[in-house]
């Protein structure tokens, strides 16, 4: 449940990959806290639809984060519309080719994954920095616990998220003290819509893999993102926060 407050107080945040899942959850939470939120996504139809559903404090901009020209143009649109930028959440990512064996992994698939998941956040930081600096803003990069542990055939995704953690502390060093930069690494987060969850509910075994006894929700991620963007986190930068219910700290033995 979102606890309403005015921590955002009219500030402006840009959230990428915001048309669904974690990005949509972050956007909704920030709006509830009083932020103006720009939802960026390469899915124009869905992005415009969800922005309209979120109400007057949501605004949509189409963007492929791996295309420098689109990033530059979209950031300029945001500034033209709002005149300021206080927060950047780099959430857009692709997992493919997550289950492609290394022998079958094409260079194009590898390159596209790193372009979206790693180059994208760099480009966004590059073009947003002058405006974030003017308001002592903050950046939150959405990484993954896959930067620390892997399943087979996940080379591209794991490498991109590991790189994003390194980019995070490099940006924190380069952009401080004016801009704070942190990373948040989700574990298993149930991003499915209500109908999907009802049709295929999670099992007791799914929940038991976590020390807290349940799979995560988008609100678990969104609430921490909101704190990291706020002045309450003013002494926090260059850090990674794992939001995984303790899953990466639990030893599991299969019978």
Swiss-Prot record:
EC category: oxidoreductase
GO molecular function, one term: oxidoreductase activity
Record EC number: 1.-.-.-
Coiled-coil intervals: none
Stored SUPFAM superfamilies: NAD(P)-binding Rossmann-fold domains
Active-site annotation: 157 (proton acceptor)
Chain residues that bind substrate: 144
Residues that, per the record, bind NADP(+): 15-39
InterPro entries (UniProt xref): NAD(P)-bd_dom_sf, Sc_DH/Rdtase_CS, SDR_fam
Keywords: NADP, Oxidoreductase
PROSITE patterns: ADH_SHORT
Family: Belongs to the short-chain dehydrogenases/reductases (SDR) family.
Protein name: Uncharacterized oxidoreductase PA3106
């Amino acid at each position: 449940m979102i606890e309403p407050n005015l921590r955002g107080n009219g500030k402006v945040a840009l959230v990428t990959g915001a048309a669904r899942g974690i990005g949509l959850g972050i956007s909704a939470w920030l709006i509830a806290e009083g932020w103006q939120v720009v939802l960026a996504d390469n899915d124009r139809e869905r992005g415009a639809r969800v922005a309209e559903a979120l109400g007057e404090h949501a605004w949509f901009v189409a963007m492929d984060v791996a295309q420098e020209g689109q990033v530059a143009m979209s950031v300029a649109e945001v500034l033209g519309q709002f005149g300021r930028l206080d927060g950047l959440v780099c959430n857009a990512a692709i997992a493919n080719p997550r289950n492609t064996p290394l022998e079958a992994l094409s260079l194009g698939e590898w390159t596209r994954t790193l372009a979206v998941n790693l180059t994208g956040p760099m480009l966004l930081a590059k073009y947003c920095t002058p405006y974030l600096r003017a308001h002592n803003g903050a950046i939150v990069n959405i990484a993954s616990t896959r930067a620390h542990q892997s399943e087979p055939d996940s080379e591209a995704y794991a490498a991109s998220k590991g790189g994003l953690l390194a980019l995070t502390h490099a940006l924190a060093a380069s952009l401080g003290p004016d801009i704070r930069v942190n990373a948040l690494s989700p574990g298993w987060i149930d991003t499915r819509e209500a109908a999907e969850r009802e049709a295929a509910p999670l099992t007791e075994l799914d929940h038991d893999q976590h020390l807290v006894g349940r799979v995560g929700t988008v609100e678990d991620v969104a609430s921490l993102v909101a704190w990291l963007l706020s002045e309450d986190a003013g002494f926090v930068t260059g850090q990674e926060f794992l939001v995984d219910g303790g899953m990466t700290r639990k030893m599991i033995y299969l019978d």
